[in-house]
Amino acid sequence: MPLYEFCAENITLLEKAFQAGARRVELCDNLAVGGTTPSYAVIKETVRLAKEYKAKVIVMIRPRGGDFVYSDQELAIMLEDWKVARDLGVDGLAVGVLTADNQLDKDAMLRFIQASQGFELTMHMAFDQIPLEDQASTIEWMKEVGVTRLLTRAGSPETDLKLRLERYKEYAQLADGQLEILAGGGISLENRQLFLYLPGVDQVHGTRVVF
């Protein structure tokens, strides 16, 4: 059965999304910059609402907009934000850390993996900035260390839809059932079935996936 993950930057549309079939929410703030960590009170209220609908809450852990290269100080803040969100009852986090040359920062990611044992960890769309030739090995590494899922648009906003669909198939083959593939980026109620027809892709993400 397909799973619809609603991307929310506040609580305004949450109940509408749950009533329309969303069974997981990625909660963030400031979608204008691609999402940042939401506030304590927003997380708390989202968890309360989600429980009423038996839905899951994944919280975005990102201290600012811009790139995904973080200082030690920023990483410490992100880990502390995760502890707060975890204690508020979320089901997991969405996070992504890159090096200056757009490779996955494995040392930093391992810190989040260790801090989130027993919770779900989504590698978010920072993945899409990793060079194509390095994406397969990155997926292999994520499988090995226990990342729950990969949220990806399989390209950039300019990438042709047909090419994106082909890449999703490749990602799903590489994931081999050991890493969930979550399709996102321009997916709506009207076109979501195009992505859900793909072998190995049974979940979609976005602000318009359920209404």
Where are these regions (language model features)?
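Short helix-capping segments at alpha-helix termini
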Residues: 25, 51-55, 89, 116-119, ...
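Catalytic cores of alpha/beta
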Residues: 9-20, 66-84, 121, 128-145, ...
